[in-house]
Amino acid sequence: MKKITSVLTVFLLLITINVQAQKPRIRILATGGTIAGVSKSATESNYTAGELGIYQLIQAVPQIKDNADISGEQIVKIGSQDMNDNVWLTLAKRINELLNKEGYDGIVITHGTDTMEETAYFLNLTVKSDKPVVLVGAMRPATAMSADGPLNLYNAVQVAADKNSKGRGVMVCLNDAVLSAKDVTKTNTTGVQTFQDPNYGTLGYLHNGKVFFNNIPEKKHTIHSVFDVTRLSQLPKVGIVYNYSNASALPMQAFMQAKFDGIVSAGVGNGNLYKDIFDLAVKAQNQGIQFVRSSRVPTGATTLDAEVDDAKYHFVASQFLNPQKARVLLMLALTQTKDWKKIQEFFNEY
C-alpha cells in the first residue's frame, strides 16, 4: 500500500511539474507610470508616478501566475511624460533578446499612459518577433480606492500568454480592450476608457479573464518591418510643429536652426498649413530636412496631394498616423533613407 501511495505521489508530482513547465514564460518589463504610482490617500488625485517597483506590482496581483510563468525586471522608474529615445532603444533591444535568445513566449510592459501609444508604435516597428508584446498602464495610481492597474495587468498577462495573440504586432491592453499599437490613441485625460482606436476599433477584448480577438492589423509590423535598431545608439532628431489660426512660425525656425533631421506638422483639417509655416516647410525641405504633413484632427487620413501639392514640394503625407506617431515613423525612416519618395512608401506601408 505504501508503495502504491508513493508511486501515486510521484505521479502527481510529475503531472504538477509538467503543467508548470507548460505555462508560457512571460517577462514583465517595468518602466514606471501611474500603474506604479502612489498617493497620500486613496481618494487624492495627486500622486507620484513610478514609485512602486516591478516585484511590488507582481505581488499585488498573484493571480497572474495562474496561467503563466512570470518574471520581471525594472527598466526605468519614470512618468511617461519623460519617456525618451534611450529608453525606447533599451526596450527594443531587450525585448528582442528575451524573445529571440532567452526563449520567452511573451512580453508585458508596464508604462505610463501619456506616451504609451508612441512607445507601442516604436516597438511595433522594431521588435523582431511575432510573439506577443503588450503594453499596459493605469489611469489611477496603485493606492487609489478603485485602482484600475491590477485588473489591467492581469488582463495584459492573459493576452501575452494567449496562443492567438501571436502575429498581431505590439498591442495595448487597458479597460478590457486590446488595441493595435499603430492605431491606438489616448482620448481622455483622466477616464479609464481613455485608449481607443477611432478609425478601426479594437483588436479584441477580455471577458472574465478570457481573450477574444475580432481583428488583425493589416499594415507591416515586427518581423515584416525593415527597421533594425540593433546597432543604433541614437535616433534622428524630429520635431512637431502645431498649426492654428495666426500660427507662429518660431517653432519651425527653431527646429531648422537646430538642424533637426525632420519635422512633422500637426496641421489643420486635411493636414493643411498656416502660410508662414508652409513657406518655411518648403525652405526646410530644400535644405534636406524632411517634412511630413499630419493633422491635429483625431480621425481620418492626411491625404497625399489633396490641397497641398506634396509631389511638387517633396512633402510626405502621414496617412492615418497622428502627429506623434508620424514622428516615430519618420525617425526610423531616416535611419534608412532621405529619399522622400521612399519615405512616403514607408508611410503607406506601415
Provide a role label for each language-model segment.
Residues I109-K131, L273-V282:
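Short Gly/Thr/Asp-enriched flexible loops that form oxyanion-binding sites at enzyme active sites
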Residues K23, L29, G53, L57-I64, ...:
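Accessory alpha-helical/coil subdomains and C-terminal extensions
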